[in-house]
Amino acid sequence: MAQNITLQFVEEKDLENLENVKLLFTEYSNSLNIDLCFQDFNNELKTLPGKYKKPSGSLILAFVDENLAGCVALKKLEGKICELKRLYVRNQFRGLKIGKILLEEIIEEAKKFGYTHMRLDTLPSMKSAQGLYEKFGFYDIEPYTYNPIEGARYMELKL
């Protein structure tokens, strides 16, 4: 039976979905087995939507048959450059192309905001995510932000 995948943009006053974002961001962080304190992660959770607030940022949730399945975020870096953050799909929903759907939507959102480039950093252990980024045309760049994890990969997409 086909599953119904829906996306929802999270607005500043949408308290229920901001809680869903916190839940998924926390699951994402726990899945990495590293401390994201170098990204001021705890403050990020406390101040949501924070740097992901429109008109320069965005938060998107994915649902499968109304079950919370995944998320992605976008924030302004500088000028016309944005950063992709927190692309995450829960284990039980992997294989349904939700990561691809979220990535397509956040790229379109970045274009609407007038960004010309999207950057990201990813960990060496995230091979499937890196493969997805490569399929979308992301290419390797020099480090643009601090990441203490050895082998972190920095990528960019021309929008």
UniProtKB/Swiss-Prot annotation:
It is an enzyme of class 2 (transferase). GO terms for molecular function: acyltransferase activity, transferring groups other than amino-acyl groups. It comes from the Bacteria. Its EC number is 2.3.1.-. Gene3D superfamilies: 3.40.630.30. CoA binds at L87, Y88, V89, G95, G131, L132, Y133. SUPFAM superfamilies: Acyl-CoA N-acyltransferases (Nat). Coiled coil: none annotated. Keywords: Acyltransferase, Transferase. Residues 5-159 form the N-acetyltransferase domain. Catalyzes the transfer of an acetyl group from acetyl coenzyme A (AcCoA) to an acceptor substrate and releases both CoA and the acetylated product. It prefers L-threonine, L-serine and L-methionine. It can also use O-acetyl-L-serine, L-tryptophan, L-isoleucine, L-valine, L-homoserine, 7-aminocephalosporanic acid, thiamine pyrophosphate and thiamine. This is Acetyltransferase CD1211. It comes from Clostridioides difficile (strain 630).
